[in-house]
Amino acid sequence: MRNLVKYVGIGLLVMGLAACDDKDTNATAQGSVAESNATGNPVNLLDGKLSFSLPADMTDQSGKLGTQANNMHVWSDATGQKAVIVIMGDDPKEDLAVLAKRLEDQQRSRDPQLQVVTNKAIELKGHKMQQLDSIISAKGQTAYSSVILGNVGNQLLTMQITLPADDQQKAQTTAENIINTLVIQ
């Protein structure tokens, strides 16, 4: 459980940094339709047990963040405002809804203005998951965060998608497009 909290904390740190990097998020709004389609980069992890697709402008940043664990993978765009973090951790043997609620509480303790968009159970191609979507604010900027929790074998999958929230509908659509490509075997 400590590892999950540590990795979620790292994810929140990345999300917070993306939200407060003082860059003009309007400069990244080029190619809006192509950007929202998550068909650019196919990703396979765990010897093909986990796969998904990312927008073409997102590249693998794993190993470039200093203290990188083998079970954590990071992709981002050139600005760092869009990021996807995938963490494979030990199965905590707790219900996914309980873990998502705990994550929501941790986010709220860091950002009292946190807006929870949804915290719901979902099913992706036969696999039960929990989805926590929220909007965080830092230094006048906002970020849309979608966190997916689920079990892959005997491990806990945590996938965090962080996008600029200038256009919440676009951010939500982009996150959903990535989530809908998720395949667990």
From Swiss-Prot:
Disruption phenotype: Disruption of the gene leads to phage C1 adsorption defect. Mutation does not impair vitamin B12 utilization. Mutant is resistant to phage C6. Null mutant is not viable when grown at low temperatures, conditions which impact membrane fluidity. Cells lacking both yciB and dcrB display pleiotropic defects, including morphological changes, elevated amounts of lipopolysaccharide, membrane vesiculation, reduced proton motive force, accumulation of outer membrane proteins at the inner membrane, and dynamic shrinking and extension of the cytoplasmic membrane accompanied by lysis and cell death. It is a lipid-anchor. It is found in: Cell membrane. GO terms for cellular component: periplasmic space; plasma membrane. InterPro entries: DcrB, DcrB/EagT6. Residues 1-19 form the signal peptide. It comes from the Bacteria. A lipid is attached at C20 (N-palmitoyl cysteine). Pfam families: DcrB (PF08786). Keywords: Cell membrane, Lipoprotein, Membrane, Palmitate, Signal. A lipid is attached at C20 (S-diacylglycerol cysteine). Plays a role in cell envelope biogenesis, maintenance of cell envelope integrity and membrane homeostasis. Essential for lipoprotein maturation under conditions where membrane fluidity may be altered. HAMAP family: DcrB. Belongs to the DcrB family. This is Inner membrane lipoprotein DcrB. It comes from Escherichia coli (strain K12).
